């Protein structure tokens, strides 16, 4: 029983392989036909009649041949002059705001006033006479921009005094620096001499110790 089943299985496998081989052959033949039928041949020729024709290129020297060669102005020179004058009048004056305005300096005059006695007879002690104005004194209002130039008094010795003060200050600083430098040099010299004396003293003490030993 087992042998018959094995033989049947072997026969079935052989038939299956044969059918699969045939199926592959049929598929390959159908695919080859389809590819051969789908091939399309493209034309290799070019039709120059469909290309648009270019316009003729003109030379640049012939561009202004049709342009006018002269311009005629009608009306005469008088109309042109009036038009120019009208244009000049219409132009705005840009420098109008920059014109300086000159203002006259305002003067205030203080009138003389009589001193107030408050019932005190003349000659008695009253208010001081310095409170009463003796004469009319003109008061000149100074402008905020320039001020009163008449009250300026130039002091020619101010610059010389400042230069002398600066020179004296520099001289004092220089002398102080020299004194500090000399003081430091003397201090260093003193320390050097003390060290030298201590070294000689140790040397003498060592000699005395060697002799005693």
From Swiss-Prot:
Q: Which GO terms describe its biological process?
A: apoptotic process
Membrane-spanning segments: 7-27
Phosphotyrosine: residues bearing it: 94
> So which stretches are on the Cytoplasmic side?
28-213
Sorted keywords for this record are: Apoptosis, Coiled coil, Golgi apparatus, Membrane, Phosphoprotein, Signal-anchor, Transmembrane, Transmembrane helix
Q: How does it sit in the membrane?
A: Single-pass type III membrane protein
Composition bias, Basic and acidic residues: 179-206
The keyword Transferase is assigned to this record:
no
Q: Which InterPro entries match?
A: Cancer-assoc_antigen_RCAS1 (IPR017025)
Q: What positions are modified (Phosphothreonine)?
A: 41
Q: Which residues form a coiled coil?
A: 163-211
So which stretches are on the Extracellular side?
1-6
Where does it primarily localize? Golgi
Complex formation? Homodimer.
User: What job does this protein perform?
Assistant: May participate in suppression of cell proliferation and induces apoptotic cell death through activation of interleukin-1-beta converting enzyme (ICE)-like proteases.
Please state what the annotation says regarding this protein's domains: The coiled coil domain is necessary for the homodimerization.
Protein's UniProt name: Receptor-binding cancer antigen expressed on SiSo cells
Origin species, per record, is Canis lupus familiaris (Dog)
| Gene that encodes the chain | EBAG9
